[in-house]
Amino acid sequence: MAGQSGRTFPRVAVLMGGASTEREVSLSSGHSCSAALRDAGYEVTEVDAGPDLARVLAELSPDAVFNALHGRWGEDGCVQGLLEWLRIPYTHSGVLASALAMDKARAKEVFAAAGLPVTQSVLATPEEVRARHILPPPYVVKPNAEGSSVGVYIVHEDANGPPQLAADMPQDLMVETYVPGRELTVTVMGDRVLAVTDILSDGWYDYDAKYRPGGSRHIVPADLPAEITEACHDIALRAHRALGCRGISRSDLRWDEARGLAGLILLETNTQPGMTPTSLSPEQAAHCGYSFPEFCAWLVEDASCSR
């Protein structure tokens, strides 16, 4: 039953922070979403997720949880399982889709089985990557279960040897063939594709380019041939469905213009996209006529268990 505000879930707990390498990004998303939801008429409690999260949520007993967590434990199925156990409706994808999307290697297997275009990749340990070229250069090395381009290395064709990785790299690394071309991203909202964004940055679209002011420019909608735009929409929607995503997802692609349609490659799908007003998915929602409070409210009203 709708509350006095006319909302199905008038009392919302916004989960943010957590203990992953993306904590600061999550806090930024969480504070932005909290302010937007208050503007939309919700009663909001901000929750910095910690070891006592189950107790905190049980005491708060919110009508729904807005998940603004990023990275490990927040978007890999862990907190989703806790919310299912507590039977609190929550936003974004459920346990299985979240776990699959966070595991890049398994997500790629799902994409390949669905006939989506992916590039060659293998799993390796840091020791193996440091010892020899796992793939012919150029290739990319990145953690198999991290987001926000944390810990990404590019090995160029003229590299003298394998990369000297940081000592704190996780044991599961994905090594994949480097895909040249334009950086594109597409948000799916429910069963609707919002838009394609062309991301312009100086060099690799890394953590700094994503979050440092002026680190990149976003062109919405991307200036693309109609058949490429249509193909981007199709790939993003099929990826969303193949993983079983709910709420919103954002799929990242590369397009090598010289190869036409054959140059369009799906890199990964993110079940917990950044959620500040200037993040990629909210920008696309704004292009489609949704204010940031309306976009956040849509996510809350879409919340459920058994996702």
From Swiss-Prot:
Q: What class of enzyme is it?
A: ligase
State any GO BP term from the record: peptidoglycan biosynthetic process
Q: Where in the cell is it found?
A: Cytoplasm
Taken from the UniProt entry, a GO cellular component term is: cytoplasm
Q: Which cofactor does it need?
A: Mg(2+); Mn(2+)
Chain residues that bind ATP: 135-185
Q: Any idea what this protein is called?
A: D-alanine--D-alanine ligase
In its UniProt entry, the species of origin is given as Cereibacter sphaeroides (strain ATCC 17023 / DSM 158 / JCM 6121 / CCUG 31486 / LMG 2827 / NBRC 12203 / NCIMB 8253 / ATH 2.4.1.)
Tell me what gene encodes this.
Answer: ddl
